[in-house]
Amino acid sequence: MFMYPEFARKALSKLISKKLNIEKVSSKHQLVLLDYGLHGLLPKSLYLEAINSDILNVRFFPPEIINVTDIVKALQNSCRVDEYLKAVSLYHKNSLMVSGPNVVKLMIEYNLLTHSDLEWLINENVVKATYLLKINAYMINFKIDLTVDEIIDLVKDIPVGATLHLYNILNNIDLDIILRISDEYNIPPVHDILSKLTNEEMCIKLVTKYPMDNVINFINQDVRYSPTFIKTIKDFVNEHLPTMYDGLNDYLHSVIIDEDLIEEYKIKSVAMFNLEYKTDIDTLTLDEQIFVEVNISYYDFRYRQFADEFRDYIMIKERRQITMQSGDRIRRFRRPMSLRSTIIKKDTDSLEDILSHIDNAKKNSKVSIEDVERIISSFRLNPCVVRRTMLSDIDIKTKIMVLKIAKDWKSCTLTLSVKGIMVTDTINTVLSKILHHHRNIFKYLTSVENKEIAVCNCSRCLSLFYRKLKSVRCDLRTDDGLLDRLYDLTRYALHGKINQNLIGQRCWGPLTEILFNENKKKKLNNLMEYIKISDMLVYGHYIEKTLIPITDSLSFKLFVDTMSVLNDQYAKVVIFFNTIIEYIIATIYYRLTVLDNYTNVKHFVSKVLHTVMEACGVLFSHIKVNDKIEYELEEMVDKGTVPSYLYHLSINVISIILDDINGTR
């Protein structure tokens, strides 16, 4: 089976024969090339056709001809802005900035606006300062004025760290405001304005309320040197030992002489105040031993010889080992990271790097097509290779050589062994099928997504023996309960509604991992960490509340680089099938780990696979499950290893479903 259908390969051949000039091929072939992403930069004459095919094609046109509303739609459908979309967005930046607050929000999230842009937006009253601050307070580094009500409203909606940043950019901040915010929202008043507070009792209350936040550094100097204040803080520190508050210790060190601190705290003074103190470990009291062990990281850094001797002492005396400990004891406020970015993480051996290497090699020596095919083999069956090749800076002759190779790629049909089981390599075949038929599949899914499955009269539902929700009354502690819930989930999916977050993780299945180079380093047992408190507990009528239409599902928003995604429809069809596989894996994993049920595993796996097919209206197909599935699933649970054979079985299931939906079965 070829990667591309015959008509797409023919259109690509025509494009190659025209030296990659898409304007010189027929309109029929142009539409095919657009549908399959077989193009590079596009001419003005194809604007409407390209935008109708996929809104993100807007980035491949000269910026001066692009409609601003199309850029907005493209930004809304992206999670990362690549160099092409960034270029057209910056070209039309002024128009985008006055296109409404939602567009401004997108531009901020994509880092398309400078500090001066934000200042202009506020000064010209295009958007309110509070709106921008709620998006990302750290973007604003110039002074602003807000009313008390606006400040309080902001504090309710932004993180603590952002509030502290807000204090630094307000012209009209006063003591009453930060004290009120501390009382009502428990945000530390760490601002110079706090030094105006002279009430010693209130100062003590604030310091002891926020011992980790260094409020002590902003206390009025007269209060800091008050004997009563010093004694109260020292008593507080002593009361909480062996827990240490570095900021308070630094304060005590600044107001009490070293000799007095050493006399009172002895070996503790090394960790608390970074003072020098020598002692024999045999003389340590039990309280001192506990303190040293809890704070061993301080001794590792400040008195390593003592720390090593203490470890040896505990090993000999108590036959246990004190591990290395490290870490900053002071809480630091971390700035929230945007879910969107203009930064693309580049692989060390990206396609562009390899193409450049081939191009340079051709200039210096003869390079055979076999050599090129071998070098780019790791990108075999990647549907975006053609587009990325045409967008690259390499010589046109090198581009044509690569395109000829990609045009004739076939899906692999050789057999391979997975833990002694001979299976066919089905994933490439399935991905090729999806590439061939993704528009038909997407058309079907969107045609049924608004139908209520309990009363749906589509051809698939009419063929079912049971058309209502099975899991309305079910016991998820039993196999029947799990299968009933899986049946309902799958029926919803077939009607265009999916749960991308079933186990608390998105898109961890094999299709998105392989197709979009989403290398999940986490083991499966780590991915399933929250399965006990996830949507796996939802059943019956409550299932629908956890679902989203396939048309609203994350597609480009899932991936690091939009250049790695062919188009929106293709990505969503991949997500649809990937989600069904996730349902299968999660159901089996839940039975094994949460219910601790390992009886008749092979039989249960078979039931899961056939339940999914039945829910999709495929009633007369059979998937044979090998006995060795039980050993593989034990390894999956115990070691988190990828269940290759189970993936193979699941991919066989979605291949059958795909063929059935497409009418090619």
From Swiss-Prot:
Primary location group: membrane
Location of the protein in the cell: Membrane
Name of the protein: Protein OPG074
Transmembrane segments: 573-595
Family assignment from sequence similarity: Belongs to the orthopoxvirus OPG074 family.
GO annotation, cellular component aspect: membrane
Membrane topology note: Single-pass membrane protein
Expression induction or repression: Expressed in the early phase of the viral replicative cycle.
Family matches, as InterPro entries: Poxvirus_E2/O1 (IPR021155), Poxvirus_O1 (IPR006732)
Native source organism of the sequence: Monkeypox virus
Domain of life: Viruses
Pfam families: Pox_E2-like
Record key words, sorted: Early protein, Membrane, Transmembrane, Transmembrane helix
